[in-house]
Regions:
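C-terminal alpha-helical cap of glycosyltransferases
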Residues: 506-521
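Catalytic binding pocket for nucleotide-activated donors in carbohydrate/polymer assembly enzymes
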Residues: 395-400, 429-504
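Donor nucleotide-activated moiety binding/catalytic core segment of transferases
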Residues: 217-227, 387-432, 437
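Conserved catalytic-core segment of nucleotide-activated headgroup transferases in glycan assembly
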Residues: 172-180, 184, 188, 318-395, ...
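Basic, ligand-binding patches in group-transfer machinery
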Residues: 1-161
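Active-site and donor-binding regions of nucleotide-sugar-utilizing enzymes
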Residues: 20-23, 43-49, 55-60, 64, ...
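A short, gly/pro- and small-residue-rich
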Residues: 247-268, 353-363, 439-450
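A nucleotide-sugar donor-handling region in carbohydrate enzymes
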Residues: 132-150, 266, 272-361, 387, ...
Length: 521
């Protein structure tokens, strides 16, 4: 019989969380630890405990949050015997209690600790900064919307509401926006009547989106939360919970969000980053429908993610419908856009500035050979950081007017892609957009060993890439020089690969997406 340990009681007094763990099996644990599995800064804190045996094993233990570091972390409990290690799961009563009542510790410094259920209802202790959505006002809106949705659902079901959004609901410039714009501008009024876009009022695109005013839902407003509960379908470039406050405490709304169907527009094309553990059918954020851009990508999703082929339509990315080459031969631009690193996300500035990622790009921006090459050929380098690392953009700087640093949201990414003459990236799926436009791509993969170890890919980085691969800075400078001298012409061997990597290049992707949804709803 499988041994399962349940968390059956949680009580909080000041900075200490007191817990009862129980199992139907007899256990004699040697140790209990609170473990953080952060890949770059793992940690383990011993927990004191007492144990009793009757007809079951009962363990009393506690967590002193005063001993834990104040940074974005998820901690789990590991109960170890001589031969096995177990992670306790929350029983149904505790899961309900965490949703209905407030279990949290505010240790100061604008941070928050709270217990929650992870994958498979595993106990997690989350630490994160306080946000403006942690107050009583948000909880009242959530509860009111939840109760009203229960009353309205039978009447509103026939409306077939679609909610469209992007990462963190903070922007309108990716596949979500372009599909929404298609719906607003190409569909007849009756067909677009119940299609809405979720957007934070602090978004740089908020003002521009007001022309669609009645179809815009202000993020975390009462109307937004109500429509989240009543929607028939989410259509998004990221997971379901990007439509709600990020990393919330246990609540009624998140559970309902996770029960909704979603058409996944994707943020980019799969290949350079393994994400099946996240977006797979049995992953942390499974999808209902999964848009892809080629038969090759469809094979990845059916083979590695576990989806049926009829749920993986080959339709193309919505934003490609507006892509066109706008590069200027008089002022050439090298777009530099590296992807994020899981080990750097939500870390502090000091940690980030000590990373190879930061130091590599800062060293590149100061490379005299590169700066001379740019100056001599009237070329500018444009650096655009990934949205998950946007808070670190202020740490980058360059004294050269030839290096332009653009904060996330200041300029639509599509515009940067269309205006560039060439892309320098590492593992970012933005490479597919540039390749779609028949522009050269250089893959600067200075930390490939660590990346393969922590992320992995579906493509063979040494043989399958559709652009030059560089590991060292001198290789990168040489590759840049070669492309400048060839007037940024794509190499023939990379041109030949395109027909197998794109099923369509006809600017009808949004139409295919819409037709598929209508046919399958």
């Amino acid at each position: 019989m499988e041994t399962i340990i349940y968390v059956t009681s949680i009580k909080i007094k000041k900075s200490i969380i007191y817990m009862t763990l129980q199992s139907d099996q007899k256990l004699d644990p040697l140790s209990i630890e609170l473990v953080c599995r952060n890949k770059m800064s793992p940690a383990a804190v011993p927990m004191v405990f007492s144990i009793s045996h009757t007809d079951r094993t009962v363990i009393q233990t506690c967590i002193d949050t005063g001993l834990l570091r104040l940074q974005n972390d998820d901690w789990e409990i590991v109960v170890s015997s001589e031969t096995e290690a177990y992670t306790p799961i929350l029983d149904s009563h505790i899961r309900a209690a965490l949703i209905l009542f407030s279990y949290k510790i505010k240790p100061g410094h604008n941070f928050l600790f709270f217990p929650m259920g992870g994958p498979g209802h595993k106990f997690l202790l989350r630490c994160r900064p306080l946000t403006k959505y942690d107050g009583a006002g948000t909880q009242i809106r959530e509860l009111t919307a939840f109760l009203l949705a229960k009353l309205l659902k039978p009447l509103w079901k026939k409306k077939k509401i679609w909610l469209i959004y992007e990462k963190y609901s903070s922007s309108a410039q990716d596949n979500g926006f372009y599909f929404f714009r298609y719906c607003m501008e190409q569909l007849p009024p009756q067909e677009r009547r119940h299609i809405y876009f979720i957007l934070d009022k602090s978004s740089p695109q908020w003002a521009d989106m007001q022309k669609y005013k009645k179809h815009i839902l202000p993020f975390m407003s009462f109307r937004h939360i109500l429509y989240l509960l009543l929607a028939d379908l989410y259509v998004a470039s990221d997971a379901r919970l990007h439509a709600f406050a990020w990393k919330p405490m246990p609540n009624l709304i998140s559970r309902e969000i996770n029960r909704h169907d979603i058409f996944f527009l994707q943020h980019g094309v799969l290949g350079l980053k393994r994400v099946d553990a996240l977006f797979g059918k049995n992953g942390a954020s499974p999808m209902t429908y999964f848009a892809v851009s080629s038969d090759a990508e469809q094979h990845i999703v059916t083979e590695y993610f576990g989806y049926e082929k009829n749920h993986v339509p080959v339709v193309g990315l919505a934003r490609w419908d507006v892509l066109e080459d706008r590069s200027d031969s008089a002022q050439k631009k090298l777009l530099v856009m590296p992807t994020w690193r899981s080990w750097l996300e939500e870390k502090d500035d000091d940690f980030f500035c000590k990373s190879d990622y930061y130091q590599t790009y800062m060293h590149l921006f100061q490379n005299k050979e590169l700066l001379e090459l740019l100056k001599k050929n009237n070329t500018r380098m444009v650096f655009y950081i990934h949205p998950k690392l946007k808070e670190f953009m202020k740490s980058f700087h360059s004294e050269s007017p030839l290096i332009q640093l653009i904060p996330f949201g200041q300029c639509p990414l599509n515009h940067l892609i269309m205006e560039c003459s060439m892309l320098i990236t590492d593992y970012s799926s933005v490479c597919w957009d540039v390749y779609y436009l028949e522009k050269p791509v250089i893959f600067y993969q200075f930390d490939s060993d660590l990346y393969e170890k922590t992320n992995g890919s579906y493509m063979d980085m040494e043989h399958d890439l559709f652009g030059d691969r560089c590991i060292r800075e001198d290789q990168l400078i040489n590759a840049v020089r070669d492309y400048i001298q060839s007037d940024f012409h794509e190499k023939e061997k990379y041109k030949k690969m395109r027909k197998d990597l794109f099923a369509f290049r006809d600017h009808n992707n949004c139409r295919r997406i819409y037709d598929f949804i209508i046919k399958n709803r």
